Curated annotation (Swiss-Prot):
Record organism: Drosophila melanogaster
Protein location: Cytoplasm; Cell membrane; Basolateral cell membrane; Cytoplasm, Cytoskeleton
Classification of source organism: Eukaryota, Metazoa, Ecdysozoa, Arthropoda, Hexapoda
Span of domain Guanylate kinase-like: 780-955
Keyword set, alphabetical order: Cell adhesion, Cell junction, Cell membrane, Cytoplasm, Cytoskeleton, Developmental protein, Differentiation, Membrane, Neurogenesis, Phosphoprotein, Repeat, SH3 domain, Transducer
Domain SH3 per the UniProt entry, residue ranges: 620-690
Region (Disordered) location: 161-209, 424-477
Entry membrane topology: Peripheral membrane protein
Record's protein name: Disks large 1 tumor suppressor protein
């Protein structure tokens, strides 16, 4: 099929369409090759566009040039292009020919450079002027048509978004004029621009496309921002005297990491066609802030430079750059009885090395396949795995995905490993004194009162909205932790480098919603205040100017040179929205401070056999707990190291609970434990944080709905309304039965004496952790559904699974009716006194009174159903959970937690807003009172989703091995 000239613009579209259809694994090599062709095509098309536009501006639009000059230049440029077969650098050509706009006089008088053309034009001045003018106008019209076509193609190829307004040719010309001066190498720029611009290191060594790769990257700003940090500028060069704006970090979850093309050490040339070459750091930051939601970056990087792997890149890409970056090797392992024999850490959301989403080897098992092979080392980066003919990329993936990939290996596997000395050093803390994530957390400073150090050293977090452990001030945004947790495990020591000036630097940080995003230590004995940790993605990290190891000399002109820790914390706390820091990079002093912390830790460990107090605080305590709250480490800026996320009901193996503030833990998944270890807040820390948060906002039961009861406690109203509760002080009122959400006739429900007492004190209860132990059972667990929709869920379970779910027969003192059968409809108790004695003896999990008759559910009835292999569905209150546990019948207690009042109304459209509000408040109150007894909490947007989650929880908690409360103290 012949190629038509008018269809040339579709070449790129056809190529990209073909590339998109290559989805099979065997097409990978072809895809990579086509990607190279597309990049080259785009680069050359863009270069041609710049050359034509430059010619148009410097020659045709130059009013200082005569028609003869423009004609001569045009002919020479055309001849040059035809001869060379490629575009010519217009500015360099005009300069070499003395044809630029500042050389008009020399052009007209230089016979040696254009003697032939000049003599031909001067033979008939009038005729030739008319002819030349007509020729130039014709050329201009032709050029304009061609330029518009190229510009329209360019806009189609690199349009920002589908909804973006299509720029006009005139707007595009103006944008390209600014971009071409910033995006092309200095040799391609206008000579006057080169002479007028400030020279910078690195610019002189550029050799066009031989030294640099240029790339246009379009990012869409999401909830996590653009997701990268920058450094550099004319006021703060990043490398030597190079004032370029460098990419220094890619933030996990950000737009840049998701896109996968931007790399660390890339140089930003322009932002949305605004040049950031030779500009102050603040100007580059401002350009990024003003760029809007769709940001187009024009970046360059040196050829042959190893870059941070992009998201989605395969192992082959890593091997392609291995010659100049990390050494990439392949290791064949055969899975044995001990598995592959190594542990991993890292991944998106659980970075092992700050700023790096890679998966790293953290432990080699004795006698395992990896140790026997001998080539795999701690600190190696796992790039990909190949098994059964398929290759799985493990760069920029979650930790869970990496674990699942390794677990799916059945026998033989090939590991693609990146060996980098830097990674190994970082992973181990940068030195022998560094803490690793697996090491023991140490005691608080208050318990380290030795003769050598009586001072208290805190780690200060300037981002967490919680109350200081030493203060009851509600508005405090600072949380101190102990001295030995001040050094984040696994975080590299501050390493001296000449890239960071040792002179004091002025740094401005805009405080974000969660604070400044860095920690400080020090402040005792005149040792200074040092930055010990910078939160990834926080304001300090995004600015890229503050460094770990910086000493803070002043905050908003408040001198901190000899300040105490408390004075520095107060200065930062009251610094306002914009904070100006005077910092000096002093890594040696900071490392000495860190070494002192390590020395204190070692002394504490060596002295463990001494006093009883020291022994109790330094021994490594391990236990299993059930989490009674949801925890997202990304929202806890006080973390000294990598956090471990979990949900309400998750089982955690706390491997080290010796610290008062932070525990080390890993999740228990079924019969196994996750290899990923992380930091979680201790029981004490979490409860303190929650009480501080709720100090000014107390939930008052249904006092909000009934102002007349504001001053009455729940227990007082019980005693006032029902005299029966004085005889049986575990009775529950009719209005509270309705609060539980039952649609049945109201009647009184029994508590036990200790339940009643506990309820009066439960208002201050904060749910944190429950100590648990593993137990094997030989019965089917009862099921208790609490919260809105419980009646519908109960009915659906029995209807859908009649062979798996059932109900027990209740007891009553009511006389038997003619059609009723004892033991089928009710267990009829002969006397009221007998049933009252059984209630007092805790033989009933719940009982109540209706029309002067007692009704109740006995432990024996529930056990009878459980031993028949059915889940006994119980419509009871939260107090029955504890009574079943005492009777060794551990129920699966599922709480359906509504998301909002609106969600309650959505699931029951017959409800009024007032009814929905009361239902929602009752549910929240129920969670506060009984949350510690819930097996799990379920939320959803639809009834079907909630029902599905409830079933999944019941199946997963059915046994035969379950986790039950233990008596171990937390």
């Amino acid at each position: 099929m012949p190629v038509k000239k008018q269809e040339a613009h579709r070449a790129l579209e056809l190529l990209e369409d073909y590339h998109a259809r290559l989805s099979e694994p065997q097409d990978r090599a072809l895809r990579i090759a086509i990607e190279r062709v597309i990049r080259i095509f785009k680069s050359r098309l863009f270069q041609a566009l710049l050359d034509i536009q430059e010619f148009y501006e410097l020659t045709l639009l130059d009013d200082s040039k005569s028609i003869q000059q423009k004609t001569a230049e045009t002919l020479q440029i055309a001849t040059k292009w035809e001869k060379d077969g490629q575009a010519v650098k217009i500015a360099d050509f005009i300069k070499s020919s003395n044809l630029n706009r500042n050389c008009a006089y020399e052009f007209n008088n230089d016979a040696s450079s254009n003697q032939t053309n000049q003599s031909a034009l001067n033979q008939n001045p009038i005729a030739n002027n008319v002819s030349a003018q007509a020729q130039a106008e014709a050329l201009s019209r032709t050029f304009k048509s061609e330029l518009e076509e190229i510009l329209n193609q360019r806009m189609r190829i690199e349009s920002d978004t589908e909804n973006a307004k299509e720029p006009t040719v005139e707007q595009q010309q103006k944008q390209q004029q600014a971009q071409q001066r910033s995006s092309r190498s200095p040799q391609q720029q206008n000579p006057q621009q080169q002479q007028g611009s400030k020279s910078r290191s690195g610019s002189q060594t550029v050799n066009g496309d031989d030294s640099w790769l240029y790339e246009d990257i379009q990012l869409e700003r999401g909830n996590s921002g653009l997701g990268f940090s920058i450094a550099g500028g004319t006021d703060n060069p990043h490398i030597g005297t190079d004032t370029s704006i460098y990419i220094t970090k890619l933030i996990s979850g950000g737009a840049a990491a998701a896109d996968g093309r931007l790399s660390i050490n890339d140089i930003i040339v322009s932002v949305n066609d605004v040049s950031v070459v030779d500009v102050p750091h603040a100007s580059a930051v401002d350009a990024l802030k003003k760029a809007g939601n769709v940001v187009k970056l024009h970046v360059k990087r040196k050829r042959g430079t190893a870059t941070t792997p992009a998201a989605g890149s395969a192992a082959g890409d890593a091997r392609d750059s291995a010659a100049s970056g990390p050494k990439v090797i392949e290791i064949d392992l055969v899975k044995g009885g001990k598995g592959l024999g190594f542990s991993i850490a890292g991944g998106i959301g659980n970075q092992h090395i700050p700023g790096d989403n890679g998966i790293y080897v953290t432990k080699l098992m004795d006698g395992g396949a990896a140790q026997v092979d001998g080539r795999l080392s701690i600190g190696d980066k796992l790039i990909a795995v190949r098994t059964n003919g398929s290759e799985k990329n493990l760069e920029n993936v979650t930790h869970e995905l990496a674990v699942a990939t390794l677990k799916s290996i059945t026998d033989k596997v090939t590991l693609i490993i990146g060996k980098t000395q830097h990674l190994t050093t970082s992973a181990s803390g940068g030195g022998g004194g560094g803490l690793s994530s697996g090491q023991q957390l140490s005691q608080s400073q208050s318990q380290l009162a030795t003769s050598q150090s009586q001072s208290q050293v805190h780690q200060q977090q300037h981002a967490t909205p919680m109350v200081n452990s030493q203060s009851t001030e509600p508005g405090s945004r600072y949380a101190s932790t102990n001295v030995l947790a001040a050094v984040p495990p696994g975080t590299p020591r501050a390493v001296s480098t000449e890239d960071i000036t040792r002179e004091p630097r002025t740094i401005t940080i805009q405080k974000g919603p969660q604070g400044l995003g860095f920690n400080i230590v020090g402040g005792e004995d005149g040792q200074g205040i040092y930055v010990s940790f910078i939160l990834a993605g926080g304001p300090a990290d995004l600015g890229s100017e503050l460094k770990r190891g910086d000493q803070l000399l002043s905050v908003n002109n408040v001198n901190l040179t000899h300040a105490t820790h408390e004075e520095a914390a107060q200065a930062l706390k009251t610094s306002g929205g914009v904070v100006t820091l005077l910092a000096q990079y002093r890594p040696e002093e900071y490392n000495r401070f860190e070494a002192r912390i390590q020395e204190l830790k070692q002394q504490a460990a060596l002295g463990a056999g001494g006093s009883g107090t020291l022994l109790r605080t330094t021994q490594k305590r391990s236990l299993y707990v059930r989490a009674l709250f949801d925890y997202d480490p990304n929202r806890d800026d006080g973390l000294p190291s990598r956090g471990l996320p979990f949900k309400h009901g998750d089982i955690l193996h706390v491997t080290n609970a010796s610290d008062d503030e932070w525990w080390q833990a890993r999740r228990v998944l079924g019969d196994n434990e996750d290899e990923q270890i992380g930091i979680v807040p201790s029981k004490r820390r979490w409860e303190r944080k929650m009480r501080a948060r709720d100090r000014s906002v107390k939930f008052q039961g249904h006092a909000a709905a009934n102002n007349n009861l504001d001053k009455q406690s729940t227990l007082d109203r019980k005693k006032k309304n029902f005299t029966f509760s004085r005889k049986f002080p575990f009775m529950k009122s009719r209005d509270e039965k309705n609060e539980d959400g039952s649609d049945q006739e109201p009647f009184m429900l029994c508590y036990t004496q200790d339940d009643a007492n506990a309820e009066g004190a439960s208002e201050e209860n904060v749910l944190s952790y429950e100590a648990v132990q593993r137990l094997s059972i030989n019965y089917t667990r009862p099921v208790i559904i609490l919260g809105p929709l419980k009646d519908r869920i109960n009915d659906d379970l029995i209807s859908e699974y009649p062979d798996k779910f059932g109900s027990c027969v209740p007891h009553t003192t009511r006389p038997k009716r003619e059609y009723e059968v004892d033991g089928r409809d009710y267990h009829f108790v002969s006397s009221r006194e007998q049933m009252e004695r059984d209630i007092q003896n805790h033989l009933f999990i719940e009982a109540g009174q209706y029309n002067d008759n007692l009704y109740g559910t006995s432990v024996a009835s529930v056990r009878e159903v459980a031993e028949k292999g059915k889940h006994c569905i119980l419509d009871v209150s939260g107090n029955a959970i504890k009574r079943l546990q005492v009777a060794q019948l551990y129920p699966v207690a599922v709480f359906i937690k509504p998301k909002s009042v609106d969600s309650v109304m959505e699931m029951n459209r017959r409800m009024t807003e007032e009814q929905a509000k009361k239902t929602y408040e009752r549910a929240i109150k129920m969670e506060q009172e009984f949350g510690e007894y819930f097996t799990g909490v379920v939320q959803g947007d639809t009834i079907e989703e909630i029902y599905s989650k409830v079933k999944s929880m019941i199946w997963s908690q059915s046994g035969p091995t379950i986790w039950v409360p233990s008596k171990e103290s937390l």
